[in-house]
């Protein structure tokens, strides 16, 4: 007996996104968004995962593209699910670079403490909720060492094991 009928859409409208919490000298990196629902709001940087791109590489790429900062994905902090989009929220380690706006997707880069960010009216609701949780618990799911035999560390990662 078949319980569910599923027909694969010819063109998927589902998106996979990433964003991240990056601390530099005790302050969190934010950008001021220039378009869409978050226009003129501050949020933690992120963006969409490209075809065949690992989410860890996507968040590192997005941070570099948007802020000129090189960072390394450390842990999965949280995951947001919507019917049309999934977003993985990472914690990241700072590697190098001076934070600056890309002048396109964002108009400003800010470094704020968690309390400074939470006190602002211009922060997105999602970033606010992530920070509220982060203030209470900074621990996420770390990347494991296991790599499937048919894969390499460049195209495989498992978290929490």
Question: What function would you assign to each model-found segment?
Answer:
Residues 80-100, 110-116, 130-138:
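Active-site-adjacent beta-strand/loop module that shapes the phosphate/pyrophosphate-binding cleft
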Residues 69-78:
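A short coil-to-beta-strand element that immediately follows conserved catalytic motifs
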Residues 1-19:
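Acidic, metal-coordinating catalytic segment for phosphate/diphosphate chemistry
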Residues 23-28, 37-38, 50, 69, ...:
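Short, charged/polar surface micro-motifs in flexible loops or helix N-caps
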Residues 24-61, 65, 158-161:
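Conserved Nudix-box catalytic region and its N-terminal flanking loop in Nudix hydrolases
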Residues 12-14, 82-84, 103-106:
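A generic structural micro-feature
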Residues 107-161:
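Nudix hydrolase/Nudix homology domain
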